[in-house]
């Protein structure tokens, strides 16, 4: 087996400790079935189990160390279930060209990338995270996004989550704070964001709904190939401003028309349109209000086909129309950026 073929899978499994088959199947370019079988046969991976997923053996960790990637072997096998969620996020980051291997706050502040919460909890930042549900942090320009993997039965203390995100924003030198909500699909993420109040002693815990609705920046991200493309585009500075002229207009002209949350005038519908590739749902009502105030009878949401299928369930006609952004336009935008994903 060639080192370059082995390294991504070995490094990600060693870093995340446990990766399940569901995650591996969504990124076949990294976790090729033939490769995984060979790694088990050669003693670098333990045989797969439903409880622990894929795990490195001691020889696997030694193989990484010999190639300049020393990673602490697993010490807490009872945490495997939540690690599957953490790994899905980390692998999606990697597939988008965002390094998930930052080993502390100084490296994150200096180099960017994705800082997993499990690194902070294992080292010097446990006091910062406490019992918060955050799974990591990623920087998008001057906005720090606190990454969450919500579940319908998982509750949060809103002020604690806000305080945690704002503290990391200050330490990272970012100017603003937002949230990136991850999951298996847009639908499953959205369902998990619908919560109810629940009294828990003297502290009020509740579902993720208010954390989502109260955020200035909030994005939905599936942990799969589509999510990797979405993240890749989000990393391109001012990607909407660069994409708007390819679709029919410019962001600057929309600002002049007092529609800052719209991105261009759709040439087919002749209506204001908002680019939804980043799945920032919270701004849609603002864009709709601005379009109405400007005298338009509707709003176009421009997205990938898979995103469109989800958005149609939330934003019904006749006010909302939909436009699918062609792959060739996305290719032009990606080729014009400096950020390139490894897979």
Provide a role label for each language-model segment.
Residues 37, 42, 46-69:
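Accessory beta->alpha helical hairpin/"wing" motif in late/C-terminal subdomains of nucleic-acid enzymes
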Residues 7-13:
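Hydrophobic residues on short alpha-helical segments
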Residues 16-28:
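Short acidic, hydrophobic short linear motifs in intrinsically disordered regions
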Residues 182-343:
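Long, compositionally biased intrinsically disordered regions
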Residues 2-7, 18:
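Short helix-coil-helix linker/hinge
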Residues 26-42:
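Short amphipathic alpha-helical interaction segments
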Residues 78-161:
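Exposed, interaction-prone assembly regions rather than primary DNA-binding/catalytic cores
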Residues 59-88:
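Short, amphipathic alpha-helical interaction segments positioned at domain boundaries
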């Amino acid at each position: 087996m060639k080192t370059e073929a082995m390294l991504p899978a070995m490094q990600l499994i060693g870093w995340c400790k446990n990766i399940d088959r569901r995650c591996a199947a969504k990124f076949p370019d990294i976790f090729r079935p033939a490769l995984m079988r060979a790694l088990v046969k050669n003693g670098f991976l333990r045989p797969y189990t439903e409880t622990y997923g894929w795990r490195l053996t001691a020889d696997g960790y030694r193989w990484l160390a010999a190639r300049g990637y020393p990673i602490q072997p697993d010490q807490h096998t009872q945490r495997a279930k939540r690690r599957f969620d953490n790994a899905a996020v980390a692998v999606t980051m990697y597939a988008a060209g965002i390094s998930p291997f930052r080993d502390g706050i100084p490296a994150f502040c200096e180099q960017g990338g994705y800082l997993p919460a499990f690194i902070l909890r294992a080292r010097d930042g446990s006091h910062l995270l406490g019992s918060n549900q955050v799974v990591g942090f990623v920087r998008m320009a001057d906005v720090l996004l606190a990454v969450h993997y919500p579940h319908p039965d998982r509750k949060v203390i809103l002020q604690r989550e806000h305080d945690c995100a704002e503290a990391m924003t200050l330490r990272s030198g970012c100017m603003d704070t937002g949230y990136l909500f991850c999951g298996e699909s847009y639908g499953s993420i959205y369902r998990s964001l619908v919560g109810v109040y629940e009294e828990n002693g003297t502290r009020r815990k509740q579902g993720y709904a208010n954390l989502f609705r109260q955020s200035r920046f909030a994005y939905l991200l599936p942990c799969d190939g589509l999510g990797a493309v979405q993240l890749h585009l989000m990393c391109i500075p001012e990607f909407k401003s660069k994409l708007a002229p390819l679709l029919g207009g410019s962001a600057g002209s929309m600002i002049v028309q007092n529609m800052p949350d719209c991105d261009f005038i759709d040439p087919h519908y002749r209506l204001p349109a908002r680019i939804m590739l980043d799945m920032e749902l919270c701004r849609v009502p603002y864009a709709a209000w601005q379009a109405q105030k400007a005298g338009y009878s509707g709003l176009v949401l421009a997205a990938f086909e898979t995103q469109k299928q989800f958005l149609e369930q939330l934003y019904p006609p006749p006010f909302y129309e939909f436009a699918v952004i062609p792959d060739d336009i996305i290719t032009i935008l990606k080729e014009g950026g400096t950020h390139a994903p490894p897979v």
